[in-house]
């Protein structure tokens, strides 16, 4: 093998010695990364490299790993298809995602840029929406998987785990956008918590989101992201998904790529062409914007030439870099100048083109288990916009100052970030040092843009073991052969990872920093690098990080030698206690410091807490015997213990034992005198979750029973640190935790717990809430005492969460004990029952609608409730359900009368004496109706209506000419003429069997006053027998006022009409190509208008 690969290796080494423009040569003419874009003028080498053009003499020199940014070694060609690298699919495409295409379309249309032109009349293409949904669902799975691993430390998923997962999976820019969106949504949610209608509005509405937060929460529970899901985590994940959708959609719309263009990997299977990559035109734009011409855009993009046209499983084969002069890129930009001004369209083609050419989102949306970062579908390495200094050439401290870096320094820094291989640990240390030095001031000037190093206490640094671990994954033995003192090995015992699967250094840094930041550490250790390798490299895996005492150990250089020595001794003491040997307790305590056995680590935890996390019952007993404090709390002082996780503040050893479900340890702590409520003191506010809340959330029946036996209070909730809470006892009590996670048996256990009597001291809020109920002798159920009132509030909150998350059985259980419905909880329960096709439950819920107070009717009834109920009516073949829906519709229509039709006052026009009606002697025009002449006068008819004027104008004025009128009976035509000659309908004698024909004639001759008169007669004569005929006739003629009146009659008398066969045929008959559906839509619209006028308007019924 060595002999076979010797010549290609020599060729590759020759390529490695060529200066690609980043070796610091000031006279390099190919100093731009854009010059590395692949070009058809340089055919691919059979050795997997590129045929380089003639080079300047100054470029023939040896250089370090800066040249490995986009240089492919010969072994790459053997593994370009990731053979043996386990490029398996991430997961099958999700069958069910926590959003619908309708919600996705509404989200994208709401966030549409007005500059993109008018919206498409028919909405966004369904195939493009489905494609986008499938792609982003992969990002959802990636973020959920990382959040799942992070949540193992505390057996709980909070907003911090979701935010860290976003920073791990997403690029710096995307993570910043998602974090900002999540913070905005959570702020709106917290502000809405202070309102009295918080349980009457959905979580999405309270957050200002389009996707259902409750559905995302249920998806997280069903996907086992964690044993416990905090509601803020679901809000963060929902906002993150919406932000991703908006970001990708805006990039597609802003791309301006014509539909005929297709990038690599867009389905055609062709290899990348000259215009592939993140866009030659945008790159050329960067050249022009930056000072120094092409040199200024160095590091913006690094392209790779294609050795073959096919696509590999990771990316199209990209070999060594090929040079393209800046002029060629400018010509390419000019070539696409007109394309950039074409109206962008959101189609499958433009979506694929944008994704394939965007290095920030292409790898994220691929189906492979590992995450491809920093490259697009062509294998082009690119820096994200947040790290590209050339986008802001004046990035200095003050205007007028010199730039922070020279152009050569910028190229060196950016190439440090893009390096994929190193030859030695010294070289890697230099690269990491350059990269971290670059990221530090960038983050300081643009704080909050998602870049790393966000700790205010100091800069992050790399531990030596972390650098050695990173060097193991990035090391390239062949690069050592440049040293003339090193002889290449004759036998290759190592399998080289192909270039295509190697991430750039900036991605190693990004992921490692995100892991270190999640545990609030100031240094990256080797485990952070292994976690990054697991994510970024195919076929690499490692266990999730466990909660350890040395997670955040930091030997900061700011501390003196004495302080560092004390820290090392303390760390040794914790290690001795964590090893599990009970015979080392006395020796370990002597090393911990002045606080002894109760010494806290950097994470604010004592040795007893760590033993409870491990479930080491023997060590717990030994620590208790040694005098460990049972009820000491995790501190909440970040300036002294900056590595404390925010969610663990005020937790006790019992809390940690409950978190990880160690029942024997819980029993031991309780027997030893641990407080069953954790850190909660009687009468004080609770800012952390109690052990019972945590046990109820996970559904541990045995643990819940044990805590209840020891006196735990299920009514205690959690106060948010911003002071916003709806009840004195906080939110998300144990009832709500069990209901939110769907633990029905635990909820019933909590419900069966007898109430504890409180003291007779009343708070001011309780006094005001009591009101006149103090004097009542027979209060309703659940209101017999102040405890019962608190329980009722807790159960109402639990009912809200169970309905939001789709646990309808728990919701019904809560309703069965007398907790009243809100409109929102009822609608959510009905929606879930309909989706699950549970007919008996639908009937039960529909029967309960009348228990909802009309004062609680909100806009949700119109926007969400009516569409749902009419959909059930359309889909249901059950007569009982249909009758119940009719009862609801009639109830919502209200007792007020149907809006009356009013006569139209006819404008005063010329009129003739009735004596001239059908008088042959005085007439000047003759109509022929049913073969019989009818004599009239033009002077009257010309001004009667536009229709008569058109009839008279279309006929010659010769004597004896008759105007034939078809489809109108003679008697009906006579009534029309009588109306005209008499000047009104007062003298008309209309028979019942003539009214419909007269209405048709009035509509045909455009006589609005006569038409309205006929409509009024029809409205007065409407009954259950003829209402369907009148409605059909009115719809056929297009008489909207009479149609609306009939729809009001239907809704007001629907309970009776549902037994009418003609009415049922009108609703359900599909022979008319969707006629039934149109009727239901019209009824829904009419009922919505009615509800608005009598329930939701300020007049409350005065306007009907």
Swiss-Prot record:
GO biological process: exploration behavior; protein stabilization; synaptic transmission, glutamatergic
Localization per Swiss-Prot or TrEMBL: Membrane
Chain positions of ANK repeats: 603-632, 649-678, 687-716, 730-759, 825-854
CDD domains named among the record's database cross-references: BACK_BTBD11, BTB_POZ_BTBD11, HFD_ABTB2-like
SMART domains linked to this entry: ANK, BTB
Gene Ontology MF terms: PDZ domain binding; protein heterodimerization activity
Induction trigger: By all-trans retinoic acid (ATRA).
Keyword Repeat: yes
SUPFAM superfamilies on file: Ankyrin repeat, Histone-fold, POZ domain
Keywords attached to this entry: ANK repeat, Membrane, Repeat, Transmembrane, Transmembrane helix
UniProt GO cellular component terms: glutamatergic synapse; membrane
Membrane-related topology note: Single-pass membrane protein
Region: Disordered, residue numbers: 260-301
Signal peptide: none
Name used for this protein in its record: Ankyrin repeat- and BTB/POZ domain-containing protein 3
Source organism: Homo sapiens
Source lineage: Eukaryota, Metazoa, Chordata, Craniata, Vertebrata
């Amino acid at each position: 093998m060595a002999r076979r690969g010797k010549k290609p290796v020599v060729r590759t080494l020759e390529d490695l010695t060529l200066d690609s423009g980043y070796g610091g040569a000031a006279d390099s003419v190919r100093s731009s990364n854009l010059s590395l874009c692949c070009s058809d003028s340089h055919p691919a080498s059979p050795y997997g490299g590129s045929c380089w053009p003639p080079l300047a003499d100054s470029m023939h020199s040896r250089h370090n790993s800066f040249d490995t940014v986009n240089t492919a070694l010969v072994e790459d060609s053997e593994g370009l298809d990731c053979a043996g690298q386990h490029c398996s699919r991430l997961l099958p495409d999700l069958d069910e995602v926590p959003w619908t295409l309708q919600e996705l379309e509404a989200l994208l249309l709401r966030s549409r840029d007005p500059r993109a032109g008018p919206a498409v009349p028919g909405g966004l293409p369904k195939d493009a929406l489905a494609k986008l949904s499938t792609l982003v669902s992969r990002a959802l799975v990636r973020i959920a998987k990382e959040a799942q691993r992070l949540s193992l430390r505390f057996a709980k998923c909070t907003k911090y785990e979701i935010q860290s997962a976003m920073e791990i999976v997403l690029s710096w820019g995307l993570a910043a956008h998602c974090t900002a969106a999540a913070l905005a949504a959570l702020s709106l949610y917290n502000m809405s918590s202070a309102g009295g209608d918080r349980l009457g509005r959905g979580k999405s509405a309270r957050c200002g989101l389009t996707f259902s937060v409750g559905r995302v929460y249920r998806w997280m529970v069903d996907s086992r992201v964690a044993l416990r899901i905090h509601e803020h985590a679901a809000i963060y994940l929902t906002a993150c998904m919406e932000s991703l959708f908006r970001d990708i959609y805006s990039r597609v719309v802003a791309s301006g790529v014509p539909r005929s263009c297709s990038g690599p990997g867009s389905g055609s299977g062709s290899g990348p062409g000259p215009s592939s990559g993140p866009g030659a035109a945008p790159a050329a734009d960067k050249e022009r914007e930056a000072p120094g011409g092409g040199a200024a855009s160095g590091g913006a993009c690094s392209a790779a030439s294609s050795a073959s046209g096919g696509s590999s499983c990771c990316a199209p084969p990209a070999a060594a870099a090929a040079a393209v002069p800046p002029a060629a890129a400018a010509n390419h930009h000019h070539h696409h100048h007109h394309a950039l001004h074409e109206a962008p369209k959101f189609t499958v083609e433009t979506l694929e083109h944008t994704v394939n050419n965007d290095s920030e989102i292409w790898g994220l949306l691929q189906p492979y288990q590992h995450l491809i970062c920093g490259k697009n579908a062509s294998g082009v390495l690119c820096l994200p916009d947040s790290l590209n200094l050339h986008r802001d050439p004046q990035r200095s401290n003050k205007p007028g100052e010199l730039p922070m870096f020279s152009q050569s320094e910028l190229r060196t820094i950016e190439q440090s970030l893009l390096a994929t291989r190193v030859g030695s640990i010294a070289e890697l240390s230099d690269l990491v040092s350059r990269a971290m030095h670059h990221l530090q001031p960038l983050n300081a000037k643009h704080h909050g843009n998602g870049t790393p190093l966000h700790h205010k206490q100091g800069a992050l640094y790399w531990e030596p073991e972390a650098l050695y671990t990173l060097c193991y994954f990035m090391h390239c033995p062949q690069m050592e052969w440049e040293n003339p003192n090193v002889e290449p090995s004759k036998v290759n015992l190592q399998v080289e990872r192909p270039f295509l699967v190697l991430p750039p250094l900036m991605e190693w840094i990004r992921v490692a920093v995100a892991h270190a930041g999640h545990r609030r550490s100031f240094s990256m250790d080797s485990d952070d690098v292994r976690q990054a390798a697991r994510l970024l490299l195919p076929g690499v895996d490692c266990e999730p990080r466990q909660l350890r005492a040395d997670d955040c150990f930091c030997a900061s250089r700011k501390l003196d030698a004495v302080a560092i020595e004390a820290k090392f001794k303390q760390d040794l003491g914790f290690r001795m206690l964590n090893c599990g040997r009970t015979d080392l307790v006395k020796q370990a305590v002597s090393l911990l410091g002045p606080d002894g056995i109760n010494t806290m680590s950097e994470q604010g935890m004592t040795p007893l807490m760590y033993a409870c996390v491990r479930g080491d019952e023997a060590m717990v007993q030994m620590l208790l015997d040694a005098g460990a404090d049972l009820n000491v709390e995790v501190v909440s002082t970040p300036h002294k213990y900056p590595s404390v996780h925010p969610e663990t503040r005020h937790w006790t050893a019992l809390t940690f034992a409950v978190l990880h479900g160690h029942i024997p340890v819980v029993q031991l702590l309780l027997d030893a005198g641990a407080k069953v409520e954790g850190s909660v003191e009687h009468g004080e506010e609770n800012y952390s979750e109690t052990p019972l809340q945590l046990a109820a959330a996970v559904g541990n029946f045995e643990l819940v029973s044990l805590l209840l036996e020891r006196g735990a209070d299920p009514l205690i909730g959690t106060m948010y640190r911003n002071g916003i809470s709806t009840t004195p006892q906080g939110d998300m009590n144990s009832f709500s935790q069990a209901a939110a996670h769907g633990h029905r048996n635990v909820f019933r256990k909590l419900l069966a717990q007898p109430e504890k009597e409180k003291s007779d001291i009343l708070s001011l809020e309780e006094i005001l809430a009591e009101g006149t109920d103090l004097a009542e002798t027979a209060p309703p159920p659940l209101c017999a005492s102040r405890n019962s009132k608190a329980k009722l509030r807790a159960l109402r909150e639990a009912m809200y969460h169970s309905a939001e998350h789709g646990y309808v059985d728990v919701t019904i259980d809560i309703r069965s004990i007398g907790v009243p419905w809100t409109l929102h909880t009822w609608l959510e329960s009905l929606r879930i029952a309909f989706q699950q096709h549970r007919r008996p439950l639908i009937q039960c819920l529909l029967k309960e609608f009348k228990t909802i107070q009309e004062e609680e009717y909100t806009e949700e009834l119109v926007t969400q409730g009516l569409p749902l109920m009419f959909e059930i009516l359309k889909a249901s073949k059950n007569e009982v359900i249909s009758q119940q829906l009719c009862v609801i519709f009639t109830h919502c229509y209200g007792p007020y009368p149907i809006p009356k039709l009013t006569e139209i006052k006819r404008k005063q026009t010329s009129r003739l004496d009735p004596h001239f009606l059908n008088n042959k002697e005085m007439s000047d025009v003759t109509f022929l109706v049913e073969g019989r002449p009818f004599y009239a006068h033009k002077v009257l008819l010309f001004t009667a209506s536009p229709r008569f004027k058109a009839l008279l104008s279309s006929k010659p004025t010769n004597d004896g000419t008759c105007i034939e009128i078809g489809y109108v009976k003679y008697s009906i035509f006579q009534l029309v003429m009588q109306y005209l000659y008499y000047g009104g309908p007062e003298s008309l004698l209309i028979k019942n069997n003539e009214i419909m024909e007269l209405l048709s004639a009035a509509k045909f001759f455009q006589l609005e006053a006569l038409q309205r008169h006929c409509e009024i007669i029809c409205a007065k004569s409407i009954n259950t027998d003829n209402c369907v005929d009148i409605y059909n006739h009115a719809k056929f003629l297009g008489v909207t006022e009479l149609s609306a009146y009939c729809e009001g009659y239907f809704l007001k008398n629907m309970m009776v009409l549902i037994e009418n066969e003609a009415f049922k045929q009108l609703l359900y008959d599909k022979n008319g190509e969707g006629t039934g559906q149109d009727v239901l839509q019209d009824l829904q619209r009419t009922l919505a208008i009615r509800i608005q006028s009598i329930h939701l308007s300020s007049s409350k019924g005065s306007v009907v």
